[in-house]
């Protein structure tokens, strides 16, 4: 093995060792420190808000019953189906009890031994079971058979009208609530996916934070707009501690951040400049930061014209410094564009400055050198004083 081959071999071993050490350091920070100090999220990766309201008085809780429609829509499916079944069974039983009372007051029950030529309020109600079945037939409108109302009692006629109207209201409300629950744009938001990790690398000569987002449906989101909020704990000059201090984070794509053409996966990025809250962070100190980056995507569903919002969040362990996303869009032989979602969240390591301040300081130094303000080739030397020429 010659000297040149040995030097190449040493360089290769050194590069592999540095990369292995970097991966081990990243794994150690993520799995050891990440587990020992689990960060609290305001927004989960799926977009659910992790917030709990405590010490809410009874008067404030009553507001939820005033806005009963929104309360029913926000119920989980198991509670909604419980309310659905309880509403129908409860109304059938309640009106069955009222029909039994009508028959009892009018002495139509067999225990009163009514004469054969006497016309009852409701024919063939012999007890609570038959009264419940008559209530079910009335409210569901399946048609009368053996039991029916006569014109003998005005109370029975009024109760029949009242139950029919109330049954229509219950049917409309409960069926409408289930239909609205199914058609909520929240379900459309499930087909919008974000990358598990955010990356920081150079893009267009600038240091950027990049996130990949994809629409799993072929139908578009009209008027899509994407933005972010950086949540962290800050202390004001007056000494006040703000737990969830919000800072606006502007995200753009190459075509701008308004009216995105969201037909294929997009890589959105935030430029880390002097106005960015990430400007003073570095690769070595990123995992030690305490922040949460919440990303929002607003748009209008093309098929229903309903507005939906998709949310996700990133904590420092989920931001990879010095990586970029793998390309996933290719062109087939048939002339179609193919998206490989197998590599949607995959990243590759790239050469990246370890801090934004270093990148911009280097650019400023180069600019000063071009203008002659900082020229290392210019050397100032002392000149000996000479006497004036004597005449």
From Swiss-Prot:
Question: Which residue ranges are intramembrane, renumbered to this chain?
Answer: 128-139, 140-146
- Description of activity control: Inhibited by WNK3. Activated by phosphatidylinositol 4,5 biphosphate (PtdIns(4,5)P2).
Reactions listed under catalytic activity: K(+)(in) = K(+)(out)
Q: Where can this protein be found?
A: Cell membrane
Motif (Selectivity filter) on chain? 141-146
Identify the main location.
Answer: membrane
Ranges of the Extracellular topological domain: 103-127, 147-155
> Residues that bind ATP, according to the entry?
223-230
Task: Indicate the transmembrane segments per the record.
Answer: 78-102, 156-177
**Main function:** Inward rectifier potassium channels are characterized by a greater tendency to allow potassium to flow into the cell rather than out of it. Their voltage dependence is regulated by the concentration of extracellular potassium; as external potassium is raised, the voltage range of the channel opening shifts to more positive voltages. The inward rectification is mainly due to the blockage of outward current by internal magnesium. This channel is activated by internal ATP and can be blocked by external barium. In the kidney, probably plays a major role in potassium homeostasis.
Name-wise, this protein is ATP-sensitive inward rectifier potassium channel 1
Origin species, per record, is Rattus norvegicus
Could you tell me the gene encoding this protein? Kcnj1
